[in-house]
């Protein structure tokens, strides 16, 4: 019979950890994140640490996106506890920009190499949210698996908060009772949900991007990795109306758009060579309707990020189409997502580099970077060079396809000068001519002698539809 976890009050967690790790200089704590963030545990532990006169052991909190309150990044806590964030927003992003939290650069597919046995951030403690099946007694990590298996396998103390209203998902989200040491059942906060996208009213620029991707790259039987956000929603909306069949899903984040396609039967996963018959994801994030959909549904199964983002797995589900967005792209094909500029951290790299490198041969599929040509303030997202000091998710040697509302720049196999011409050609018209002149006049950018201004360069397909911006 499996050992059952000990039920404790959330206020007791800090004392349990102080007693267990008495004499240690620091404690590495991995926190389950995203929609299933264990906010009750985070708040209770933070309050206890703040009230304690002890400064040792020091708590290092490793995590992904934490949507709720994150008291341990507040001012005055950093001599006792600090965030090491792989992906950030809200309070953690602000704290990182003010020096009260660390950004820990890591792709989602490589988290296990950072927190695994003997690694710098091997967890001593894991905090997570779980739900439980009233039929089998099994626990499920529900909406977020990410790297929790690796964390649990190598940690000494596992603390869970039980949220019986969280969806019970299948696959590798399911764990037995003996995997949990302590469980909190009172004062638990609900999972985080977000408004469902309006797929019928997608803005013109995003819709154009969706049309370009759907018409040029999506095929019957393709496997998709599509994130969440306005541009991925536009791709979903276009696929919905385009008549595709037998699509599959292998993705980090499963959102409302993929649910809509699966409900319509457009996604059925029949053609996937691996994990045939069900969508695979590592995180679910979106609306209440989405959470109701994935609850107990065998057609959507959870896997760790090291699996969903694995090049070996991706290459077994060809043709594979990966769609991600970015902060910007430069003339050389460099892409950045984590920073707006060297002084302003924004989020993290997610799994974008994992999929770009997994699809480094056209035989495997297409890694697409989809961006609007300008920011909301009218600044070009295509620039001559990336901001100095920012980390890159794709470099000039990565074979990517860039899509804006003005066209497609397929950079695969192009020389440096042709890459620059291709990227500049899909810039916003307010910038395009100046960019092209800059490239043509630059002797360092080797171009064909036959190139004439106004020609469409190799690799470029301009938007020719009717959607207005």
Predicted regions and their residues:
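Conserved alpha/beta enzyme-core scaffold
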Residues: 1-469
